[in-house]
Amino acid sequence: MLFLCYIYELVSYLCFPDILETEYMRSHLLIGAASSGSGKTTFTLGLLRALRNRSLRVQPFKCGPDYIDTRHHKMAAGCASVNLDGFMMSEGHIKDLYARYTSNADVAVTEGVMGLFDGYDAMRGSSAEISGLLRIPIVLVVNAKSTAYSVAPLLYGFRNFRKDLNVVGAVFNFVASESHYSFLRQACEDAGVEALGYLPKCADVEIPSRHLGLSLDED
């Protein structure tokens, strides 16, 4: 428990001054990525704790049936996280759950699953499907290790692949330096996606994985 709380607090101070000041943080946000391992959960946990530390009532959600990430969400946000599963649930049930649990929240943060468009049958059941169904703006977490301006076409593709989705910005993970981030910020500008901040390389900010997902503190 202490280890995880340390991670939440550390991440919340590393990268959020930009994103916390944007209009997108006033209500709803979905955290997506190009692939698993980009840092969605690390970023989401820090964001939940940062919002909580600002005395905001934050409601976390998780795309898919994952029961491990939701337990981390609860520790970071101070309230139970809710699964939104496009495979097991009807669209009506997902909408009802989302409306019910966001009714008393200042901010709702939904963590995606795998890559943004990855579902059980093409995009069916994907984070993108949940975003489109609930009209939630998307922030992409991008693994910037060993890349710089090459993220521009990636961001452009994610922003334009489905016109009904609203990709509002990107946060970069594993950033080596301010100079590195300047290339990434330029890539965002040229791709038409707002750069919202970054997580620097930091060995302390890592939650080990196991076969069913991220490790829990009691493991």
Report each predicted region and the residues it spans:
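Hydrophobic alpha-helical signal peptides and transmembrane signal-/tail-anchor segments
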Residues: 1-14
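Short, Lys/Arg-enriched N-terminal segments with co-localized hydrophobic residues
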Residues: 13-24
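ATP-dependent carboxylate-amine ligase catalytic core
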Residues: 22-38, 42, 48-134, 142-169, ...
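Short hydrophobic alpha-helical runs that function as membrane-insertion/retention elements
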Residues: 138-141, 196-198
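Internal gly/pro-rich beta-alpha loop/helix module
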Residues: 149-219
